[in-house]
Amino acid sequence: MHSLDEPLDLKLSITKLRAAREKRERTLGVVRPRALHRELGLVDDSPTPGSPGSPPSGFLLNSKFPEKVEGRFSAAPLVDLSLSPPSGLDSPNGSSSLSPERQGNGDLPPVPSASDFQPLRYLDGVPSSFQFFLPLGSGGALHLPASSFLTPPKDKCLSPDLPLPKQLVCRWAKCNQLFELLQDLVDHVNDYHVKPEKDAGYCCHWEGCARHGRGFNARYKMLIHIRTHTNEKPHRCPTCSKSFSRLENLKIHNRSHTGEKPYVCPYEGCNKRYSNSSDRFKHTRTHYVDKPYYCKMPGCHKRYTDPSSLRKHIKAHGHFVSHEQQELLQLRPPPKPPLPAPDGGPYVSGAQIIIPNPAALFGGPGLPGLPLPLAPGPLDLSALACGNGGGSGGGGGMGPGLPGPVLPLNLAKNPLLPSPFGAGGLGLPVVSLLAGAAGGKAEGEKGRGSVPTRALGMEGHKTPLERTESSCSRPSPDGLPLLPGTVLDLSTGVNSAASSPEALAPGWVVIPPGSVLLKPAVVN
């Protein structure tokens, strides 16, 4: 007896198949419909209407035990699964494929005639293919392994409507001949199309050719070029079976198997060797003093000897500059850096805040609302003050031309920044933009309370010159601290020393930590 754990043999007789089913039912019991669903790989348990092409009940696999079944399935006896449809479909008189002895034993009803199989539709439209249905709603269904339904592979035939591969069609101008073999196409192009033209040499008229009619001065060059269109690769590696269109590429490839490296670096003291000249040329760029490939992002001064290194830098840091931005950079060059101090000191009586480039400040290269380039040079804030800042003459120790005590900076009225780069445009939360020093002593008390405590801890690490400058910047008893020379500690947050933004002095702008860089500079 055949085992049902093996793939189903469609040549089993009715008696053997029924005996195997009865023996399995005695040992395993009745298989539930959901178990049969899982065995057949059916996920959806929702009721589905019967297929219009399903065969009548006599053609279904089912147990002989009656059971109440839904209207979508009907009880049907076991039938012979053969490799061909029932003979009643082919014979004109509707004769059955089952013997009279099997019909007379009472187990099997008479097989339906050919007229009952009219709505039956076969797979792929081929009448010789077998199609059967399993009653999923019956209780005593036959347990079939999933491997039983694996059909043998069939030869795939392409539809005549599908287009032929492009390499088998001659795309030469006014020539669309079809070929079955690639060699036939290559011979056709080489014999009929590769011909010299008057005053032009060997020109390629293949559809979509990038040369656009520019000819070759030799026939062998034309034949090599044609291989880019026909995809011909006649040179094959005997070791790994890779094919190449040019013999030189095959020779270079063979060196990967032999380990030969004939190209040596020409620089003295460098004995690196390479298998091809292009890799050696890339290596020789590392010995150049000049680095012609540089980053075009404002504020970035990276330069490289190899273009691939520049591409890696641009991809890693997001320094993508469009053509429009490059034109603006050429029209508006970045300002020159400030001159160094004549006495070698860090600064005289001012401070500068360097605003980073747009990519570092906003986190992305594409800023449609921001005019580029943003000047990468330092922004001098030492001379910025509110409107009525030219107070009393307490300006001892200041540089010439600077106002007296410089009041809190008002970045919203900054004349050095264009209008889109106000305090709100830079994404800086504006606490107060009040002009003047109308706050009085009470607001001065708040201003003194907003000084971070970390700034006091930094006094022990300062140089003597920094201690002198910080001593001059202590807040006066009547109002706000005097600038320039004030030590600003931006490393702490807004609420580090004050519980609310109201503790800040009027006119000050809260700058997030890490957004700006304080740098000593010279005020001319």
Curated annotation (Swiss-Prot):
Region of interest called Transcription repression, as start-end residue ranges on this chain = 148-171
MF terms from GO for this chain are: DNA-binding transcription activator activity, RNA polymerase II-specific; DNA-binding transcription factor activity, RNA polymerase II-specific; DNA-binding transcription repressor activity, RNA polymerase II-specific; RNA polymerase II cis-regulatory region sequence-specific DNA binding; sequence-specific double-stranded DNA binding; transcription cis-regulatory region binding; zinc ion binding
Q: Cross-referenced Gene3D superfamilies, in alphabetical order?
A: Classic Zinc Finger
Q: Does the keyword Metal-binding apply?
A: yes
UniProt keyword list: Activator, Ciliopathy, Cytoplasm, Developmental protein, Differentiation, DNA-binding, Metal-binding, Nephronophthisis, Neurogenesis, Nucleus, Repeat, Repressor, Transcription, Transcription regulation, Zinc, Zinc-finger
Q: What is known of its domains?
A: The C2H2-type zinc finger 1 has a major repressor function and is required for CTNNB1 binding.
Q: Which disease is it linked to?
A: Nephronophthisis 7: An autosomal recessive disorder resulting in end-stage renal disease during childhood or adolescence. It is a progressive tubulo-interstitial kidney disorder histologically characterized by modifications of the tubules with thickening of the basement membrane, interstitial fibrosis and, in the advanced stages, medullary cysts.
List the PANTHER family: GLIS FAMILY ZINC FINGER 2 (PTHR45718:SF8), TRANSCRIPTIONAL ACTIVATOR CUBITUS INTERRUPTUS (PTHR45718)
Q: Tell me how this protein assembles.
A: Interacts with CTBP1 and HDAC3. Interacts with CTNNB1. Interacts with SUFU. Interacts with CTNND1.
As for what it does, the entry says:
Can act either as a transcriptional repressor or as a transcriptional activator, depending on the cell context. Acts as a repressor of the Hedgehog signaling pathway. Represses the Hedgehog-dependent expression of Wnt4. Necessary to maintain the differentiated epithelial phenotype in renal cells through the inhibition of SNAI1, which itself induces the epithelial-to-mesenchymal transition. Represses transcriptional activation mediated by CTNNB1 in the Wnt signaling pathway. May act by recruiting the corepressors CTBP1 and HDAC3. May be involved in neuron differentiation.
Q: What is the protein name for this chain?
A: Zinc finger protein GLIS2
Q: Which organism is it from?
A: Homo sapiens
